[in-house]
Amino acid sequence: DRRRKLPVTTIFYSLYSKETEEKIAELKKQGKRIDPSEITGMSKEEILSYFYDIDHVEKLKKGWKVAFEPARVKGVKFPFDLVDADTNKVVWEKDKKLTVRSAQKLVDKGLKSFLVDDNYLYGKFLAKALVIAKTGEVIADAGAELNEELLTAINEAKIKELDLLYIDNVNVGPYIRNTLEADRNTNREEALGDIFKVMRPGEPVTLEASEAIFKMLFFDEERYDLSSVGRV
């Protein structure tokens, strides 16, 4: 039933954030319960970091410094000379295929990172929101795709470090990231409300009722107390 379908990320938004889980655990030790107003759901950044490895890149005078990972470059032909970010020396010629063995040899010789220009970053996605420290202005949200316009804004803002999602479109796809972009919800309350509307169409939406439905669907021990042959 298409009317009952929701983006899977709506469920993730509805789950407790790591901060909330830690707070609940600490209060439990003290025999206390968390105030509902203190509960937060998973954020977009938290969801992305759960499903993707994060690559850190740093802006230097001659380009962006990217970590060299031998396991990721098997069969890769870089369209540019591979330049060691520490020595500025060419360590591998462009359009020459790398093997796991040759990549490991480069590491054994001391290669830790290499230099790339802005073009290399086009099409990659931010793991965290970009905020200008002095003004607090958010110039891009987590999950945003890097393009020429955004890279120009990043360079003009003198942002020197970026955290990017590792997506190679072979072993790791952009599916969760794309689903987050399509999800109209942005926080726990909105997500719980959407789930409630699907399960109880026409009924008035309240946070308490939405939480009750969500817990019943996914966390009711009696509902999911299955025997070895299923529910009896």
Language model: regions and residue ranges:
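N-terminal non-catalytic structural scaffold regions of very large proteins
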Residues: 1-232
